[in-house]
From Swiss-Prot:
This is Uncharacterized protein slr2042. PANTHER family: MTFA PEPTIDASE (PTHR30164), PROTEIN MTFA (PTHR30164:SF2). It comes from Synechocystis sp. (strain ATCC 27184 / PCC 6803 / Kazusa). GO terms for cellular component: cytosol. InterPro entries: MetalloPept_cat_dom_sf, MtfA_fam, MtfA_N. GO terms for molecular function: aminopeptidase activity; metallopeptidase activity.
Length: 275
């Protein structure tokens, strides 16, 4: 009897955690909504992130609450002797939270740790181009998202570069955190967690068409608004068009209207207007 009671107690505890944790996060975010960031943190956001000034007062309050919750939940680790500062943590957290401003209290449930390198880092990539021969090569990366390890890796040098070049269509933080959103439904396939079945059907139809259009443009050496790296696979396409949406929104809307509208509906945000 005793083992059965213990098992039942454990199961009830797990059920209570699964049910209660999201509610606790909602409650915690509402509590933090009433607590603004320190003035010197607000000054950093205003100085480094153009979108901060464009937010409505309510959106700004919401962003600041999400930043505080994010910093409490996620662990930051400096790698290769990189020294983490409040500014580093704040700049990363703010962009991650801006991306998911309207996506609930826990948009990155699989993420535990953010590793920050001073500059681009090397990783060993194992591929099998023909399905049989395994090839290994060292590649240089500015960021990487790992699902199973609960880790995300960023290079501060690339982040600093991006901060000086808003609206160039490149943002490593948006890119890697879009991958995290992609994992929200348990699979990294270029389709994040959506609402209704119709949303999935529309998403897959438009994204498949736009992905093929990008491949065709590149094959014919035509100019593209979307970075060519998006043609790597559907996962990278979603991450790349997220960068494009937030940094080159007007161009995306003009050239890829349906794709723009799908992303606008998902993120529930208007992209940057003037930076």
């Amino acid at each position: 009897m005793l083992p059965t009671a213990i098992v039942l107690t454990i199961l009830l505890g797990i059920i209570a955690y699964i049910w209660g944790y999201p509610h606790w996060l909602d409650w915690r975010e509402k509590q933090l909504f009433q607590r603004p960031l320190p003035p010197h943190w607000q000054a950093i956001l205003g100085d480094r992130l153009p979108f901060y000034a464009q937010l409505s007062p309510q959106q700004r309050q919401k962003l600041e609450a999400k930043i505080q919750l994010f910093l409490q939940q996620k662990q930051f680790i400096g790698c290769n002797d990189f020294v983490l500062t409040d500014e580093v943590r704040l700049v990363i957290a703010a962009q991650a939270c801006y991306l998911a401003l309207e996506l609930g209290s826990n948009p990155y449930p699989r993420l535990d740790t953010i590793l920050v390198y001073p500059d681009a880092f090397q990783v060993r990539q194992i591929t099998s181009p023909d399905g049989y021969v395994v090839e290994e090569e060292d590649t240089v990366r500015a960021g990487e998202s790992w699902d199973r390890a609960g880790q995300l890796i960023l290079a501060w040098g690339t982040i600093a570069w991006d901060l000086e070049r808003w609206q160039d269509g490149h943002n490593v933080i948006f890119h890697e955190f879009a991958h995290q959103l992609d994992m929200g439904d348990g699979a990294m396939n270029g389709v994040p967690k959506l609402g209704r079945r119709n949303d999935y059907q529309r998403w897959q139809s438009i994204f498949a068409s736009e992905y093929q259009q990008l491949l065709s443009q590149l094959e014919n050496n035509l100019p593209t608004v979307i970075d060519p790296y998006g043609a790597t696979n559907p996962c990278e396409f979603f991450a790349v068009v997220t960068e494009t949406f937030f940094e080159k929104g007007q161009e995306l809307q003009h050239n890829h209207g349906q794709l723009y509208q799908v992303l606008r509906k998902y993120y529930c945000l208007e992209p940057l207007i003037n930076c």
